[in-house]
């Protein structure tokens, strides 16, 4: 497969404000936009099912025009729901969709999304395809370098190839594995130490991908 990057993301954003639960709401994002006119802003993670079934979609989707460029981050595991969420994101005017398979929260993982989804590359690929096939926005993914004992480079590389073949436009890699048993989300942000070498190896093995 030839990987052709959309014009809208050929110029990689060198600065972004990461999606953070209970933090990156539209008020926080406006403050960040005052600091930088170039940074790519992210929403908090939005559970796709909650968005699709609510009658108050504006509570999830509203943002200020000054926030562009802005990426909406979805969590979920159902391609049928994600395709509807993708259409809504495009209709609402977002610049990009980001799919979260990096969150280690027990609440998130109990819903079979977030970091736990990395154990099922084929399902993640189907989710990416659903997003890509139902909008014209760039679709990117945030993931870890592994989950629990499933942290070999070969498994990571296989995961990325699956997702690349599904059409993902960019990979944002949190350079530590997620430990879903025994650590809380706060600990998962600092334990184990970051492993930038494996991310460098991943990029070297996939030079055609935006990583």
Q: Which residues are covered by each model-predicted region?
A:
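Flavin-dependent oxidoreductase catalytic cores
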Residues: 1-211
């Amino acid at each position: 497969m030839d990987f052709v990057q959309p014009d809208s993301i050929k110029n990689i954003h060198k600065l972004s404000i990461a999606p953070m639960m209970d933090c990156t709401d539209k008020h926080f994002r406006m403050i960040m936009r005052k600091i930088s006119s170039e940074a790519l802003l992210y929403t908090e993670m939005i559970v796709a099912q909650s968005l699709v079934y609510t009658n108050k979609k504006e509570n999830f989707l509203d943002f200020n025009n000054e926030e562009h460029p802005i990426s909406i981050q979805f969590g979920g595991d159902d391609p049928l729901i994600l395709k509807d969420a993708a259409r809504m994101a495009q209709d609402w005017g977002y610049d990009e969709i980001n799919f979260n398979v990096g969150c280690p929260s027990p609440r998130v993982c109990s819903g079979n999304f977030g970091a736990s989804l990395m154990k099922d590359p084929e399902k993640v690929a189907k989710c990416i395809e659903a997003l890509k096939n139902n909008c014209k926005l760039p679709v990117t993914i945030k993931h870890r370098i592994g989950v629990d004992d499933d942290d070999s480079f070969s498994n990571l590389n296989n995961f990325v190839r699956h997702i690349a073949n599904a059409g993902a436009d960019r990979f944002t890699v949190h350079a530590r594995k997620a430990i879903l048993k025994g650590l809380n989300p706060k600990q998962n942000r600092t334990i184990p130490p970051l492993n930038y070498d494996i991310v460098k190896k991943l990029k070297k093995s996939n030079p055609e991908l935006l990583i």
